[in-house]
Amino acid sequence: MNDEYRLAGRNIWIVGASSGIGAALATELVARGARVAISARRKDQLDAVAAGQMTVVPVDVTDRAAFDDAAVQVREELGEIDMVVYNAGFWEQMDATAWDRDLFARHVEINLLGLNNCVGAVLPEMVHVGRGRLVSVASVAGYRGLAGAEAYGATKAAQINMLEALRASVAAHGISVTTVCPGFVRTDLTAKNTFPMPFMIEADTAARSICNGLERGQMEIVFPLPMAVLMKLARLLPVRVWAAAMRQVSK
């Protein structure tokens, strides 16, 4: 493992860590020797995840000023932030025939504008010190349009594009950018799904995959492998073929 990418001894801030992938990732990072701060809205849930081993900093990701204050608090508690992981996310299936503008906006507010708030809160200081890692959990749903995921998929595709552009822009400042694209992971978000979820994995398995990828210095971490292959291949299909496939799925 390249020492540049080691997790042990790093100051890592996870945003969206009260349950699911974020909580499992926080636990895995502590086990690998990282110093971890965790954030989400509910302090009681964060305290349960932290179990006295992590710094708890509650924050509403939609509140820009609160995000800036949280970043200051994390630095005061841990020191310079070596890595931030934006894992906050919202998912609810849409009925496109009864278009819900508020539901779409909620996806944008948390999944995309929250990421904007996160990057704005930590990037200037990373540029100043000349190092840092920005990590965001997107989704394989951002690779192609999926019926019912008009809002969720759009925000995840935007995340993927944003991070790809940002990676090139900040590399000269000693900052690396990693995009994490999970398939189906057993969490509170997926528990309400009524459709088939192939290749489902547990949150702790996802956390190990993320940590392994980070320690290898990967720019993109996609898992599980069967879902990664399926969705990567799906990107190559002609629009007409994909549209026909989605019509069958949405029947």
Locate each region found by the language model.
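Rossmann-fold cofactor-recognition segment
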Residues: 51-65
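Conserved glycine-rich cofactor-binding loop
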Residues: 18-19
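Substrate-binding pocket helix/loop in short-chain dehydrogenase/reductase
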Residues: 95-108
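C-terminal helical subdomain
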Residues: 179, 195-230
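Residue(s) in the substrate-gating loop at a strand-loop-helix junction
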Residues: 139
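Conserved glycine-rich Rossmann-like NAD(P)H-binding loop of the short-chain dehydrogenase/reductase
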Residues: 32-49
